[in-house]
Amino acid sequence: MLFQEFHSAMSAPAIFTSNQVYAWRPGFDKNNFTRWTKKGLLIKLRNGYYTFPEFLHEPNFAFFVANKIYKPSYISLHSALAFYGLIPETIVQLTSVSTRKTNTFENPFGTFSYKTIKPQVFFGYDPLPFSGEKKLLMAKPEKALLDLLYLYPFYKTKNDFLNLRLDESFIEESFNIELLQSLADGFKSATLANRVKNLLKVIV
C-alpha cells in the first residue's frame, strides 16, 4: 500500500487507532505501522494509537493527544490551571483526570499523566474549540483547582495555597467563586469542603 493513500484516509481524524485502520482496510498489513514509524512517517502515541509528524508543530495538539489516548479523560490539575494563566509554572507533564486507573504515557508530544477520580465527580469540564470541528475537553478553572485539592491533600493550609501563586488578576476578573462552591458541593466531601474554606480565606 502507498503511504499517500493511507495518509489521505487518516489525516482528517488526526489521531487514529489501529482498529480504525483495520475497519477502513481489513487487509491492512500491520507491519506497515512499524515500518512507517521507523521511517518517521508515523508517530506512535501509545499502543494502538498513531498520528502524523506534521502535527508536532500544531499549537495545543498535545492537549488533543491527551484527550484521545486515554478515555474518558479531561485536562485538569496543573495543566489546566497553567492553560488559563491561574498558575505561572511551566508544566513538565500534561495532567488529566480519568475514571480509569492512574497511568502515564510518553511519546514525542510529551509526558501524559492521568489521575483517577470517581465517576460521580467526573464533571466540570468544557469542550473547547480546537481545530475545525475538533474539541478539547478541559476542566473549568474552578474544577481544575478543586481536582487539585481533591487529589493532592497536602494543599490544605494558608501557606500551601499561597505557594500555588494563584494569579490575583485572574481571580478578580474571571474566577467564579459561586461556581467553585457549587462544584465543590458535588464532591460530597467534608474534607474537601474544609480545604475550599481555607482556600477562600486566601483568595477572597
Segments and roles (model prediction):
Residues M1-P72:
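Short beta-edge/loop segments at beta->alpha junctions of small alpha/beta modules
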